[in-house]
């Protein structure tokens, strides 16, 4: 009967590797060398590309932030993608160039970006910077992204911050802490190890030649994650530049926040299932260190799912040990849980003390229940892109 427990024993080994990757990244982040971004050399000419679907309510501040940072010869291009509102008119009145795309059969950010890039073929800018339509862009971010991208001739990912809206429930603060782990500590750890980072979706800069090497026309839920892996496979793995910061807030309503989390995490799981094994095989065959590092990083499931799977597998393997299936997998599970708790405590000490208080700890139970529902629906989910409603009344 011990064969019944073999899948859970193998799962424990895989989860141990995932937790080890997470632990190493978080520990390495504590040893990151502080230094200014590379800003020497001539400032290249850039085009800032904003894909926008029904974003008339939030795009004006974004355009204002970017226009104040543009230099001579730079361009700001908004792709009004399948819009049913006045996004195009608002963007044009705010000083951006605007092109319209209407194709109901091909919906999603990747298709919008591909349309925008093809419209730039005659211009051929040295650097293309992508900013989402609802993001604020910190002073100097465009200049820093442009110079670092030009100096390294690699795709660059800036610091992508998401914060809880004012007056939000405690579960938003827990979500913000998880975001800080994923998009701050972990890429800092990879940077400290001399490794690339994942693309996150906004605050990204690309040498024009890098984008020409991959097909970005996609409606997949996490096209940014997939694009980073494809670039790494082509020898153009992205680098992290925390000095260039963009920021936004989580959706205010519970339904919108749940929709956004579901979209991100279903997409991550889909990439994990569909792409990672072939990419890891390619990385080993090509001896591509950057692709292997990003594949291992992407193989780490969302933190809550990682914890739930590890706990369940350990309990089942504990039962197996009592029934004579051997104790090795159970002991490995206990060690993995210990390592995961240590990693989360280190992360909380570095990035969560201002967010997770006693009241936050009490809210973890309901938050886990919400996340469990997200994962339960993952395998039946629509993999097509769906825009998140940002606030009350927004479509």
What do these predicted ranges mean?
Residues 1-42, 344-346, 371:
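N-terminal membrane-anchoring/stem segments of glycan-assembly enzymes
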Residues 64-73:
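Short, acidic, metal-binding catalytic loop of nucleotide-sugar glycosyltransferases
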Residues 124-136:
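Short beta-strand-to-loop acidic/aromatic patch adjacent to the donor-nucleotide binding site
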Residues 27-31, 38-40, 297-381:
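Membrane-embedded multi-pass helical conduit in multi-pass membrane proteins
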Residues 60-61, 85-93, 100, 140:
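Acidic helix N-cap motif at the loop->helix transition within catalytic regions
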Residues 72, 80-88, 103-105, 135-136:
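A conserved acidic beta->alpha catalytic loop
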Residues 45-47, 75, 226:
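Cell-envelope/extracellular polymer assembly enzymes that use nucleotide-activated donors
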Residues 100-102, 106-116, 120-125, 139-140, ...:
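Long helical/loop segments within the catalytic core of UDP-sugar-dependent glycosyltransferases
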